[in-house]
Amino acid sequence: MVLMIVSGRSGSGKSVALRALEDMGFYCVDNLPVVLLPDLARTLADREISAAVSIDVRNMPESPEIFEQAMSNLPDAFSPQLLFLDADRNTLIRRYSDTRRLHPLSNKNLSLESAIDKESDLLEPLRSRADLIVDTSEMSVHELAEMLRTRLLGKRERELTMVFESFGFKHGIPIDADYVFDVRFLPNPHWDPKLRPMTGLDKPVAAFLDRHTEVHNFIYQTRSYLELWLPMLETNNRSYLTVAIGCTGGKHRSVYIAEQLADYFRSRGKNVQSRHRTLEKRKP
C-alpha cells in the first residue's frame, strides 16, 4: 500500500492533487500533523487501503528529525512516497491575486512576496526528500490531475462509470442525471392486465417491448448518440455519467431500456452500473 505525502508551496495545487488522489481510491487527510502519520497508517493497514496526506507550512515539524522519526515508525505494509508541488514565484503571486486568499504566513507581518520566499525556506527539508517534484506553473487543474493519474495508475484518463437509471416522471426527474430521455411515447405494457404487475426485468415484459420496431430504434439511436460523445466525456475529468430513462411510472419501459443500454455498454468493456428508482422504492 502507498502512503502518499503531498506537500509544496501554498498555491501550487496541493488541494487539487489531494482531490485527484481521492478519486483514485486513496483515503485522503488534509493537513495531518506529521507525528500522527504512523497512527493513521496503522489504522488503515487492516483495511488495506492506500492513503494520501497533505503537509504544508502550517503543520511542518520543528525539526527534520521529527519527520524522519515518523517515517521510520510507519508499518511495513506502507510504502511512503513524497510528492512536492511547486510553481514559479510570479505564478504563485498571480494565483493569490486571482483567488484573493491569504497566504498561511501572511499573519507574520510579511508581504506576499516575502511570505512565499519564507515558505520556500521552511519547506526545503521536504523538497530535498521528495520522490517526485512537479512544477505546476503551466498546468491547469485538469492537467495536474491527469498527470497524477498517469504517473500512479499508468493510464491517462480515469475510468468513467456509466450509470443507467430508470425512473417514473410522476415521481420526479432524478437531480443527479446528466442526460434525461423520455420514453413515454413507446408502447406501454401497463395496459396488458397480465403484464401490469410485472416489471421491465421480467421476460414477458421484455418480449412485449422487443416486438416493437420503435423500441429497437430508440435504443439504437440513444446508444449511438452516447457512443458519439463518450470519448470526450471520458477525457472531461469526471467520474460518473448518469443517463436517466423515464416513463410514466418507472416500472416497465424505462426499466427495460435502461437495462438494454447498460448491457450494451457493459459488453463493450465499459464500467457500468444500473439502478431502478421506482423498483427500489417498492422493496420492503
Swiss-Prot record:
Keywords: ATP-binding, GTP-binding, Nucleotide-binding, RNA-binding. SUPFAM superfamilies: P-loop containing nucleoside triphosphate hydrolases. GO terms for molecular function: ATP binding; GTP binding; RNA binding. InterPro entries: P-loop_NTPase, RapZ-like, RapZ-like_N, RapZ_C. Pfam families: PapZ_C, RapZ-like_N. GTP binds at D56, V57, R58, N59. Residues 266-284 are annotated as: RNA-binding. Disulfide bonds: none annotated. ATP binds at G8, R9, S10, G11, S12, G13, K14, S15. HAMAP family: RapZ_like. Modulates the synthesis of GlmS, by affecting the processing and stability of the regulatory small RNA GlmZ. When glucosamine-6-phosphate (GlcN6P) concentrations are high in the cell, RapZ binds GlmZ and targets it to cleavage by RNase E. Consequently, GlmZ is inactivated and unable to activate GlmS synthesis. Under low GlcN6P concentrations, RapZ is sequestered and inactivated by an other regulatory small RNA, GlmY, preventing GlmZ degradation and leading to synthesis of GlmS. Belongs to the RapZ-like family. RapZ subfamily. Homotrimer. This is RNase adapter protein RapZ. It comes from Shigella dysenteriae serotype 1 (strain Sd197).
